[in-house]
Amino acid sequence: MSSSRAMQRLCGLMRKAVQDYEMIAPGDKVMVGVSGGKDSVALTIGLAELRKYIGFDFTVQAVTLDPQFGGRPMDYTVLQELFAQYDIPYEIRRTEIGPVVFDCRKEKNPCALCAKLRRGALHTAAQELGCNKVALGHHLDDAVETFYMNLWREGRIGCFSPVTYLSRRDLTLIRPMLLATEQA
């Protein structure tokens, strides 16, 4: 499948999810946390494309939280140039997540702490930028994996929701790629 056809398919699935689960409303300001991986980049571009034909206006704001692993900032020039082509405002926020996790706390299993710190920084960035929604790049494969991990590790049936309201932050998390598989 060509990349343009793949993007059309992804946008169609995103549109269905957005409409079926009422993820985005007119005037919403949606922030996407961009790691630089394929899921977050596809989500950001997909949302920008979706603005063209969804039938109402909403804003997309891309943000990268640079964890500064190794104590050094990363170069995000490629993402800056890509998002400029789609008229997507893009901000890079340097954080101390890497040094805190590895130098201060010296975690043996740093993933949980790193994820918690990133979530907090992401929610703070959304609030500071005046965003009312945070779009996450979880897709159908992630939902299936989460379902089975909960079943096997915790003995319970459960998964994340397409839309989650965080009352303490007054933010809504949305997962527009939920109907798409990783191959979609």
Language model feature labels by segment:
Residues 159-183:
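Short, flexible loop segments at boundaries between secondary-structure elements
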Residues 2-149, 153-163, 183:
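ATP-dependent adenylation/nucleotidyltransferase module used to activate substrates
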